Amino acid sequence: MNSYLNIKINGKNLEKKADIENAILKFDEDLKENPDDEATIVGKSVLLYKLGKLNESLNCLNQIENIRNVSIIELKAVILMGLENYKQALELLNEVLKVDNGNISALYYKTECLFQLKRFNEVVDTANVALKIDKNHQSILINKFCSLVELNSTKEALKVKEKLLRLGLNCNI
């Protein structure tokens, strides 16, 4: 997912729940001294996300006023997607894409949101834009394929499936 989700603290990848919880406590200590530090807020939010505490993660990010960093906006969208708030996530992803229309991860997440909202034609359109940037993006190709199936566009769906198979994706689709 987003680069924030692979955060490393003190050069150590945080995988164990206890390590993550200890890191959150350290972030809390830092936030007492500097409550507006975006990097600390984002770090804590990411770790809460990693623990599956999505509401807390979102509340943490909501402490940042006037978010301008598109990576943070995208992170917020990912959290909203985890909370199944696809409409609001889509709005944020569109904000990201206004700033950087070639942001492949935002385009991918947008196809995910649109699919969940059953806006299949828009999934295909967004996928086509994204595939001009990264023609072999498997997750986007899968979303395009599934949307074409939903739209009963069998011939076009089969072309996408063939491409996925050529890319070596072992799929039962």
Annotate each language-model stretch with its function:
Residues K16-K17, K50, G82-L83, Q116-L117, ...:
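Register position in tetratricopeptide repeats
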